């Protein structure tokens, strides 16, 4: 993976991390109900960023899925850590929180990557293959 691809993946990860995280972090902890508490706009950004990565970078299908999927549980885990500093007993079941949002992030990432692959195929853009 070249440095430009790595940079694009990092930018897309943090863009998705903050668009999911900031609205989610503002919800009071006692009213959070996952996965409904995740902002729809943030999840759309995850899929859109995955689609753009597929169209514009040399990152592979699975690299994009792994990075973009991780952005959603990372935002939830950041809240777990922050709330854990304030009240150590607040997130006793944090592994379940991660397990609940992981499929949501995966679904958004896969949808975006598949859409990007479909658009690339329809426009005649060559698919980039990983060099061996």
Named regions from a protein language model:
Residues 1-3, 20-34:
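Short juxtamembrane and helix-loop transition motifs at transmembrane-helix boundaries
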Residues 66-77:
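Transmembrane alpha-helical segments of multi-pass membrane proteins
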